[in-house]
Amino acid sequence: MVKDLLTPDYIFEASWEVCNKVGGIYTVLSTRANTLQTAFRDKLFFIGPDVWQGKDNPLFIESDNLCAAWKEHACEKDNLSVRVGRWNIPGNPIVILVDFQSFFAEKNEIYTEMWNRFQVDSLHAYGDYDEASMFSYAAGKVVESFYRYNLTENDKAVYQAHEWMTGLGALYLQTAVPEIATIFTTHATSIGRSIAGNNKPLYDYLFAYNGDQMAGELNMQSKHSIEKQTAHYVDCFTTVSEITNNECKELLDKAADVVLMNGFEDDFVPKGSTFTGKRKRARSVMLNVANKLL
């Protein structure tokens, strides 16, 4: 239950989909950024992976002036490679893109630390687990560096990590910079997605599923582990609806501390003739694709 509403001085939000349009989380973050930017101005920082190296990213507007002194310090003193600029969306919030490639050399040591401190099982990792985890850990190191260089213990800072891909960074900050409050937000559980993706009835039998057992059955142990352990160890665990909260209770053995309902700006859905025109064009495209599949 929420007893008090406290306003932080600084907000750091980490996601694999910052300046990297992949799916629904990009929409969630980008369509509320304007409201956050209005409230917090340039004390709001989004952190994403620098996966467009050597290519022009239309979603990222790089700046040589933003955080210039810290960026130089992060490179020379903390061995971190970052690019700073603005997200090319309404509100234009500050973005820090992180090059995480150098952390692969420390992967085994990082995973060992996470097992010893938080019992995160990375032994069964495959696919995108390593890449996401190295980004997540690097994002945590970046926030630590920024905090040590620019802020003091009197500054109230929050780190919000979205989805299992950013869990490692949140756990790192729990011990490295406990002054920063950590929030972990799941938009749908990884094991829930896997259950549904394997054509099993998720919600009809949700009460009967054991998350750990299903993770083993579906070869999802590591992703499930980082998600579950992050949910249990961060300062505040949140999800985006009562439906996903039911997933969390059953599959992660942890109900959300707060349910943060998804929201978007009033102008997200076009109005009037603009909406009608876009609807017609979208329908035409869908019919064209469907006809080609016949």
What are these regions (language model features)?
Residues 1-294:
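Catalytic cores of nucleotide-sugar-dependent glycosyltransferases that transfer UDP/GDP/TDP-activated
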